[in-house]
Amino acid sequence: MKELIIVLMMWIGGHTGFPIPEPPIILEVTPIEIRNLMFGCEELKKQNDPMYDTWCVVDIDPSAIDVIAVYDNKSGIIYLPIYFDKNNMAHKAILLHELVHHLQYKANYDKIVSCMPMLEKQAYNLMDKWIEQNNVTMPAELTVGPLLRLTLTECRMSQPYIPEDDHVVPSAGDNR
């Protein structure tokens, strides 16, 4: 797996100019754990936030979870689903997307962009380029629909980006 990570990071660096950092820690977890990381469920529970019941219910159907993988920029950890297969090209594309975030944060790129969606847009664009270069067909459950992708990648005036407030960078899939 480490060799795959290095190859993908070198590809990203070659297309962005980002320096190649140490590889991130990779943890394989359940889809529910990925969802909990994405929504900050542990923190919501500590704060007795009413959104905990909405986003963090334990009995949710794992197939209804749209988030496939997550990068936590504070810990430098990429969380992949337990079913991740390093030989599957579509799964490699998801890993590449998360590695883009790793390189972005290690290069402090997050400090110069005007909003979080710019990071996401670059990650999706690089993933698309890699998919095209490698002639990969992405299954529907690992893709993001056009409306969700637009929402994730377009900056809005009401959406200032404050780097210290946001440490989990998702890779979403549209399971519907």
Predicted stretch roles:
Residues E42-M89, H102:
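Active-site scaffold of zinc-dependent metalloenzymes
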Residues M1-P62:
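A metal-dependent hydrolase signature that marks the N-terminal structural subdomain at the beginning
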Residues L80-I82, Q104-V113, Q133:
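Substrate-binding clefts and substrate-entry loops adjacent to catalytic sites
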Residues N48-Y52, C56, A64-I65, A123, ...:
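Extracellular/mature segments of secreted proteins
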Residues S114-L147:
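Post-HExxH zinc-binding segment in Zn-dependent metallohydrolases
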Residues K2-E3, D85-I94, V113-K121:
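Soluble non-cytosolic domains of exported or imported proteins
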Residues N134-R176:
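Long, well-structured alpha-helical subdomains associated
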Residues A93-K106:
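Active-site recognition of the HExxH zinc-binding catalytic motif
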